């Protein structure tokens, strides 16, 4: 019986691994700094105490958590002779990956709904997106994420692994791990696609439809009133494409390509959480103003001290 899995990683070249270590170390530092900066800014600035920024702060926490499931292990493995993870550790990684990944899908849908109400039904916005609604949205987000991750874990926990234990990646995920099982996994592959793949595609299509409706609504408004809404919406659409693009190919595409899968896995777990804070900061005047105020307050506090 297999008690551990060996990651093949991103490269066998020692020189390239040194470069990748430095690159991803900087990237992960940027992920931690950027996402925590958004959370601290939203919490500390009363002007940002609105449903949109409440959801944005929670998205940043999810992005940070999602990246932390895989990135630290990947970074330390660059200098390990054997990139090993225990069987239980692999199951934990699968659970957390799908918990935060599923939660991110739901919160992106919630953010799309928030923008739909704000732009298409502005008079009802404060009534619909009240404090209780925001708390309810987050409860549903974490609940669906939990149910999704439990369903993924149920697929893997009863599988028998008695042969090869090399995972051609830098982290454990169900589509890669089930290929190593000692039993026929054809039906299981279909069930995984039906679970993660259909959830991903349906969520993506739902978001595209909602953003199309919002864009059509914006077109009929005066330019001065639509520019701010369009700027915010552009940031949302960019983040949705960055997150769902890799997910569709990883979980719904029936003809995986190993080299492309590795690139998409890096993009999904490292690049997207790194870019999200940059996108929301650069495209949002309120966030930029709040960050400047936070820096001034920090500088003032330092001088006083």
From Swiss-Prot:
Chain ranges on the Cytoplasmic side, renumbered to this chain: 43-50, 114-132, 213-228, 283-305
Topology term for the membrane: Multi-pass membrane protein
Entry-linked PROSITE patterns: G_PROTEIN_RECEP_F1_1 (PS00237), G_PROTEIN_RECEP_F1_2 (PS50262)
InterPro entries attached to this UniProt entry: GPCR_Rhodpsn (IPR000276), GPCR_Rhodpsn_7TM (IPR017452), Olfact_rcpt (IPR000725), Olfactory_Receptors (IPR050427)
Compartments, as annotated in UniProt: Cell membrane
GO CC field: plasma membrane
UniProt superkingdom: Eukaryota
Pfam families: 7tm_4
Keyword Disulfide bond: yes
Disulfide bonds: 90-182
Location (main, coarse): membrane
Record's keyword terms, sorted: Cell membrane, Disulfide bond, G-protein coupled receptor, Membrane, Olfaction, Receptor, Sensory transduction, Transducer, Transmembrane, Transmembrane helix
GO molecular function: G protein-coupled receptor activity; olfactory receptor activity
TM helices/strands, residue ranges: 19-42, 51-72, 94-113, 133-151, 189-212, 229-251, 263-282
UniProt KW Transmembrane keyword: yes
Membrane-side (Extracellular) residue stretches: 1-18, 73-93, 152-188, 252-262
Recorded family membership: Belongs to the G-protein coupled receptor 1 family.
Function: Odorant receptor.
Protein name: Olfactory receptor 4F5
């Amino acid at each position: 019986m297999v008690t551990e899995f060996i990651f093949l990683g991103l490269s066998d070249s020692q020189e390239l691994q040194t470069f990748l270590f430095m690159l991803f170390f900087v990237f992960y530092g940027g992920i931690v700094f950027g996402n925590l900066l958004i959370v601290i800014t939203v919490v500390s600035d009363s002007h940002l105490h609105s449903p949109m920024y409440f959801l944005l702060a929670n998205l940043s926490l999810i992005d940070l958590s999602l990246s932390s499931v895989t990135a630290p292990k990947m970074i330390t493995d660059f200098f390990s002779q054997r990139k090993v993870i225990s069987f239980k550790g692999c199951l934990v990684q699968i659970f957390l990956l799908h918990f935060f990944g599923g939660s991110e899908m739901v919160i992106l849908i919630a953010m799309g709904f928030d923008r739909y109400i704000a732009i298409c039904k502005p008079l009802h916005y404060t009534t619909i997106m009240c404090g209780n609604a925001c708390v309810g949205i987050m409860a549903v987000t974490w609940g669906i994420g939990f149910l999704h991750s439990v369903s993924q874990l149920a697929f893997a926990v009863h599988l028998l692994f008695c042969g090869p234990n090399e995972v051609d990646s830098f982290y454990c995920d169900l589509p890669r791990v089930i290929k190593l099982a000692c039993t026929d996994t054809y039906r299981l592959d279909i069930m995984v696609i039906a679970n993660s793949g259909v959830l991903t595609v349906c969520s993506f299509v739902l978001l595209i439809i909602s953003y199309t409706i919002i864009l059509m609504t914006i077109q009929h408004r005066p330019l001065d009133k639509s520019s701010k809404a369009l700027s915010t919406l552009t940031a949302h659409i960019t983040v949705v494409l960055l997150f769902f693009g890799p997910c569709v190919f990883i979980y719904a595409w029936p003809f995986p390509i190993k080299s492309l899968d590795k690139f998409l896995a890096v993009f999904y777990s490292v690049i997207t959480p790194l870019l999200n804070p940059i996108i929301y900061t650069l495209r949002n005047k309120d966030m930029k103003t709040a960050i400047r105020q936070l820096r001034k307050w920090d500088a003032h506090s330092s001088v006083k001290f």
